């Protein structure tokens, strides 16, 4: 079970970080549900002392996702927001961050309502336009925080171009890769310094775990994140780590189906007379379709569309039978949501409208069900 250096993506997902249990030979990493570890003698231990600091199940997951994202080290946290919070401790009071303007509502809440109190400054820019990134950078800018595709309007950032601009100004780049998943894109390949995920989503893939991860490439970032993970203690528990490890093994085959179903459903919606506009990078009508073709392997499992009015959106959301009305994304089941009142409710209405999150916008996290069943469900909801 030795993983070769040139192993391909699916093989890495299954085997990276995985070692048969030395005492039993169990092929699957055990759930080490313990808070502490017995030492052989004073100062003599097997590499584990206290579970906040180290846990073998968590360590296996961290190695697995670091390899999947082509980073040097990974750090697993209790949620995606805990992972983002850890990354932000790389900054100090007075530092400035340029952020994708259409970022996740929870990220906006953390930055605006928590971190501003500690002296960090944020500028929200349309990072789909490289000139906007250049204009937003100041002498005290330390970080470029990107989300691509964005949630929920699926706007893309040219990662190669953005990283070149940032590094020219000695600014490091953080990419939230939750929406795409590493199957679709690996930001480190394009120059990113740090990648964050909510493992709750595609990495876990089964809607039964909440967690987050940071993948780093720079030694100074790795050293600091290891310290902060232990100091703050917002760690991922062993059961959740095991669930995500189970999920990453099937990530490639799940993402193939997510991508295929989303493409088919987007094309169906685009042809429906009661749908004014569909947002999906795989459609040639998407303004950044060519960038998506260059930067992404597939176009992801998320679709957004305009229903025409809040009432029409409500009719569709309440009318589906197979799809579940719920927040989150990336599970095997299809979820449908209303960003303006759900995932982005914490974003002020004027800002939501500015970035395209209108009251008629509906988001679908496309699952891996039979595509004809998904079309049938949407059809009966749209025809109401």
Language model features with spans:
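N-terminal "arm"/small-domain region of PLP-dependent enzymes with the aminotransferase-like
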Residues: 2-55, 61-64
